[in-house]
Amino acid sequence: MPTANVKSRGYNKIKGAAKAFNFDFRGKTVLDIGSSTGGFTAYALEHGAKKVIAVEKGTNQMLKPLRFDPRIKLHEKTDIFDFKLEDKIDVILADVSFLSLKPILKHFSFLKNTEFLVMLKPQFEAKPEEKINGIIKNEKIRRQIIKNFEYWLKQNNFIIINKRDNDLKGKNGNQERFYYLRLAK
């Protein structure tokens, strides 16, 4: 089933990282955390994912062509910390706002054979005084946030397979970064 009509900002964001990391979705079951309009979901399906479980705290955000795709199990108005996994998950995608990635990664750290392709938004890892109107304008602060995040990953048994800054900046100009992770066995 084609997903060509759903190339949103999210789609274009994950596209650069997935290509750079040579990430393989073929035949995999994917959990998309913070699915929003479905850009990450669409990309995963277009590149061979068997099924996507899309979890979104909001409602009515997923684009219509995706809402009716039988390969997608959409869970709207759902907090990821209340969500109960019923499927074996091969890949976790995450693009969340107003929330640190750390508690999400910690929550799923029992999934030892799962790959993680997640987007770090430094503005949501930052202290209030490190931002101006929600934007990190100081590159030194951004680099320190990234360094602290990577230290946290290592302390919590995550292995960084690859990482790169996003080709597209966030809507307000924040430079986001993708991580391809696995857990140490």
Where does each model-flagged region fall?
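Conserved S-adenosyl-L-methionine
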Residues: 158-167
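A short, conserved alpha-helix within the catalytic core of class I
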Residues: 99-111
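Conserved class I S-adenosyl-L-methionine
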Residues: 25-36
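Conserved SAM-binding loop of SAM-dependent methyltransferases across substrates and taxa
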Residues: 37-48
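Core SAM-dependent methyltransferase catalytic element
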Residues: 168-185
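S-adenosyl-L-methionine
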Residues: 53-101
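Class I SAM-dependent transferase core
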Residues: 1-25
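Conserved beta-strand signature within the Rossmann-like core of class I S-adenosyl-L-methionine
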Residues: 113-127
